[in-house]
């Protein structure tokens, strides 16, 4: 996540769309961030809008807009660094283990940093609004064009066969950039010999390197067109009226700095000139900056807003909507004008309108939001914007759209209507009556829409609302639910149907009771059933809370494949009462101790339920050896010649639940595609002592829901309203924050200690041989 800092009272708050190192806004305030392998990501919404509807689950706001992402072609001109050449020579001579290739692959993004939108005036016009990002590993700066398309942009490489800047100096590390006061692009060069993490160098080489080489040589570069020597302004000496005039300057630094100084001075003499620019400036950016400056002086009024909402430039109208929000409660003229903007020709204006309508009082937003749903509801981002604004009017909006036959006749319309029904009843449970009336009324002759709504409600609403729908008060919805379940049972049992279709039907059975579905689901766990169907049966059983669920899963355990056992264990470990049955099975021998993966042992050590922790400690009392002793004992694996094919089998059995190589396994843990370049000593250390150095994104968390379920995994994504937990079986689950009872880090890597219990020295040599062979 990102954060917003207020220098007035030294407070800050979290916001959406954080990156790793680098954040920049274009002239109109659209925010870009970057990460090591994601050079350009566009932030699509402000989290302050999302939190108004705590039931809304949305994707992370930062979206990769580079078509090739990490694999965008880069044209490096620097040679392989000396330490890489040394490592290659030592490997080829057999002095150190590992690949004899010269360092990690180059030519694509592995260290993207410092994303910056060019907003200066020193470069030729075609550079305006270009995107720049450094790649420290490749010693270059990449330039891209931001090509507009609907709500998103596409970052397309601007150069052909070359880079904007490519240095032959291996120490050149462009970590950050800025638009300078002279209109040029300024670059912070960290200037270091070593930029990689320690894990990517064998310890035997690392100990001979000066990891601080270059620490005293950092520098700032200024990139300017040949023949130009721009001067540096001193705006701190400018008069207030001069600062106001600078809001129309073609250089973004001048506009931003003038805006800041006007805010700092709080000079009331600026109000008149600002109002002149806000209404009469020939530049849309000047008009927009003037509006914000008036707001900063607490001088912005409804008349200013009304004029801006009618501005001929769409970007001015977009910002006027944001500035109008404080006036929406009291000024009927502003309210009416905003409502009339549902027909605005610009999609970005309507997108902002969908967010801003949420501040209208009472149920007044229902009509314009319904109109936007009809016009833009097929777009996923517009749906998020609309649904963020429905907290005060969801039921009224549903009533209007349910009566619109043309809207619900389309698949996007039915989909939106179903989502709205679930949101409305979650926000205000009494609105289930609105939905039931619609199903019995305008939707009585619209079977597709009614079925979509009932299915969505059963999937998303509370157990109390589900009971209401399935009970005598459910009316026609009850009959529809019965039809859906009958169809699902028939499809799930039909072995002639494709596995994917059957699996979807099996998952629909979670709407029924465990008592009625116990036997059919148990039958679907049989080993002769397709894997997809078995997995769906496990998921459906996990959705129930009955104590007997664990018995059904454990009865099928002997015939389950390793992958299916991982899924079953994930389900069983979700509730303390089920873990009790699992521990019974371990004690009785029906589940072997070797079947319990190290990751599960890690979870048991930190399980929220004390009784579970205590009992597990007794059952698995052998404990784990000291890490340094294990690492020392396994050094023999580095000296042995391993077998690649046997190593592949070791990987598939012990590692594939969290890692993926050569189309085998799950993408849960760290990416292993370039693991051979770390050196086998480092790889062995990572396997046997995973907690020696843990990156934050690979920490293990335990999450307890308000319904008593326990999830364990890594936090793979988060928004203002929800967290996404990536689980050991490779699946991911999105959990609303309001459904979280407890969330805590275990302080441990998600990769467990204790793999030596499954992998002996000979098998480790085979595994290392396999990992070292993967290209």
Report each predicted region and the residues it spans:
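Beta-propeller domains with acidic blade repeats across secreted/periplasmic ectodomains
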Residues: 1-242, 253-254, 261-263, 663-664, ...
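A short, compositionally biased micro-patch
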Residues: 26, 134, 180, 706, ...
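C-type cytochrome heme c attachment motif
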Residues: 113-114, 184, 219, 273, ...
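Sec/Tat-exported extracytoplasmic proteins
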Residues: 119, 145, 224, 247, ...
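Long, ordered, helix-rich scaffold segments
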Residues: 188, 210-216, 223-650, 675, ...
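Gly/Ser/Thr/Pro-enriched helix-cap/hinge segments flanking short amphipathic alpha-helices
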Residues: 260, 288, 687, 703, ...
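C-terminal capping alpha-helices of c-type cytochrome domains
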Residues: 290, 607-625, 680, 709-711, ...
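Short flexible coil/turn linkers enriched for glycine and charged/polar residues
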Residues: 299, 347, 562, 576, ...
């Amino acid at each position: 996540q990102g954060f917003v800092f207020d220098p007035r009272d030294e407070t800050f708050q979290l916001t959406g769309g954080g990156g790793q190192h680098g954040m920049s806004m274009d002239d109109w305030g659209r925010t870009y961030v970057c990460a090591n392998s994601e050079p350009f990501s566009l932030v699509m919404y402000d989290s302050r809008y999302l939190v108004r509807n705590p039931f809304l689950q949305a994707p992370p706001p930062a979206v990769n807009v580079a078509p090739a992402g990490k694999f965008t072609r880069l044209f490096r001109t620097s040679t392989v660094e000396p330490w890489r050449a040394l490592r290659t020579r030592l490997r080829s001579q057999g002095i150190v283990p590992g690949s004899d290739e010269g360092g990690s692959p180059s030519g694509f993004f592995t260290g993207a940093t410092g994303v910056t939108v060019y907003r200066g005036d020193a470069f030729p016009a075609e550079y305006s609004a270009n995107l720049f990002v450094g790649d420290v590993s490749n010693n270059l700066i990449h330039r891209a064009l931001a090509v507009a398309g609907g709500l998103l942009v596409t970052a397309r490489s601007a150069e052909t066969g070359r880079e904007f800047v490519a240095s032959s100096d291996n120490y050149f590390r462009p970590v950050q950039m800025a638009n300078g006061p002279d209109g040029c692009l300024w670059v912070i060069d960290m200037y270091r010999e070593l930029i990689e993490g320690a894990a990517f160098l064998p310890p035997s080489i690392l100990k001979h390197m000066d990891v601080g080489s270059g620490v005293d040589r950092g520098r700032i570069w200024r990139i300017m067109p040949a023949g130009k020597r721009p001067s540096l302004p001193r705006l701190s000496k400018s008069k207030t009226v001069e600062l106001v005039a600078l809001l129309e300057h073609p250089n973004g630094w001048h506009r931003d700095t003038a805006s800041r100084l006007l805010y700092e001075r709080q000079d009331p003499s600026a109000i008149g000139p600002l109002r002149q620019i806000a209404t009469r400036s020939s530049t849309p950016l000047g008009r927009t900056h003037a509006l914000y400056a008036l707001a900063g002086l607490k001088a912005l009024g409804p008349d200013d807003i009304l004029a801006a909402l009618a501005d001929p430039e769409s970007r001015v109208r977009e910002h006027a909507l944001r500035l109008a929000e404080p006036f929406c409660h009291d000024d009927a003229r502003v309210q009416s004008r905003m409502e009339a903007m549902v027909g605005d020709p610009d999609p970005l204006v309507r997108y902002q309108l969908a967010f801003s309508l949420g501040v209208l009082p009472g149920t007044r937003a229902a009509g314009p939001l319904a109109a936007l749903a009809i016009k833009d509801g097929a777009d996923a981002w517009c749906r998020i914007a609309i649904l963020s604004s429905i907290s005060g009017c969801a039921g009224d909006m549903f009533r209007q759209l349910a009566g619109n036959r043309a809207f619900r006749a389309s698949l996007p319309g039915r989909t939106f209507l179903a989502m709205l029904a679930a949101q409305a009843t979650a926000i205000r449970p009494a609105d289930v009556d609105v939905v039931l009336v619609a199903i019995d009324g305008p939707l009585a002759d619209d079977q597709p829409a009614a079925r979509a709504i009932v299915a969505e409600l059963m999937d998303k609403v509370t157990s109390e609302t589900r009971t209401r729908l399935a009970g005598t008060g459910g009316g026609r919805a009850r009959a529809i639910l019965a039809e859906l379940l009958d169809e699902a049972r028939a499809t799930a049992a039909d072995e002639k149907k494709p596995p994917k279709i059957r699996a979807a039907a099996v998952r629909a059975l979670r709407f029924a009771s465990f008592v009625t579905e116990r036997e059919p689901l148990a039958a679907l766990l049989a080993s002769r059933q397709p894997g997809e169907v078995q997995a769906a049966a496990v998921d459906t059983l996990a959705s129930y809370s009955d104590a007997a669920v664990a018995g059904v899963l454990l009865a099928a355990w002997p015939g389950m494949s390793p992958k299916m056992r991982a899924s079953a264990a994930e389900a069983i470990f979700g509730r303390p009462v089920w873990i009790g049955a699992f521990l019974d099975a371990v004690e009785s021998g029906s589940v072997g101790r070797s079947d319990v993966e190290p990751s599960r042992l890690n979870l048991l050590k930190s399980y929220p339920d004390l009784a579970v922790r205590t009992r597990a400690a007794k059952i698995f009392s052998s404990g784990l050896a000291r890490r340094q002793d294990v690492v020392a004992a396994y050094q023999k694996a580095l000296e042995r010649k391993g077998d690649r094919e046997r190593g592949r089998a070791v990987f598939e059995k012990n590692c594939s639940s969290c890692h993926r190589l050569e189309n085998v396994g799950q993408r849960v843990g760290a990416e292993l595609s370039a693991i051979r370049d770390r050196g086998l000593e480092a790889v062995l250390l990572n396997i046997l002592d995973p907690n020696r150095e843990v990156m934050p994104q690979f920490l293990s968390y335990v999450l307890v829901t308000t319904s008593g379920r326990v999830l364990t995994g890594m936090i793979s994504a988060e928004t203002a309203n929800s967290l996404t937990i990536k689980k050991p079986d490779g699946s991911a689950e999105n959990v609303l924050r309001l459904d979280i009872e407890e969330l805590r880090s275990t302080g441990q890597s998600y990769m467990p200690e204790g793999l030596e219990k499954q992998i002996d020295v000979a098998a480790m040599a085979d595994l290392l041989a396999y990992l070292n062979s993967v290209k």
